[in-house]
């Protein structure tokens, strides 16, 4: 009889634990999991895409915190690069960064062509100064290579053509968190049928049939911070020791120090 009472007591405790755990899970769903919080944090920026006319950013204000002076309208920075391993032990990285100062309504930056080496050799890096006027990239440095010159002058940032509404359908991603930094990452396997995947294959002549991985990274507070940053990467890499990806970020920082 004592055995049955003890068994009944154990079962009651077990049921109570399961109920409490279930309630905790429900609360997490209600409040939003870390995955959902990361997606919502990215949505604040990605919902602005596509930004066909980058000069529209002069009239848009991002997240402001105590780092901003009251009179400072801030600076938007948009960045896109295409990284590819063309040779073993080498990584070619090519793209553009543009800073749009809302105080002066001027946009300056550079186009970069960089080769990184794994053997400890210093990278080969070339930067070409640019500015933007009337939503058009103007090359400020002399470039003798006509093909490169046209590539720079006709360059389009990922954020100018990307429609990322499809990202909302992605769920159950691989999430990793470092609370000490803090930093947050989530990864999703994309579909080759996604319009943005088709667009990138066309623009960068990506021949691999492998479905890419979408990587979303946040450094800083999920609610927003002018100190941290958000980076989006679409990774087409076939193998661990090779690289084939497009990286994009759009940030809003104080213009005045």
Swiss-Prot record:
Keyword list (alphabetical) reads: Cell membrane, Lipoprotein, Membrane, Palmitate, Signal
Lipid positions (S-diacylglycerol cysteine): 23
Alphabetical GO CC annotations of the entry are: plasma membrane
**Subcellular location, record wording:** Cell membrane
Q: What is its main location?
A: membrane
- Lipid attachment points (N-palmitoyl cysteine): 23
Task: Keyword check for Protease, yes or no.
Answer: no
Q: How does it sit in the membrane?
A: Lipid-anchor
- Which interval of the chain is the signal sequence? 1-22
Q: Gene3D superfamilies recorded for this chain? A: 2.50.20.40
Does the entry feature the keyword Lipoprotein, yes or no? yes
Name the protein family. Answer: Belongs to the staphylococcal tandem lipoprotein family.
What is this protein called in UniProt?
Uncharacterized lipoprotein SA0396
Give the gene symbol. lpl1
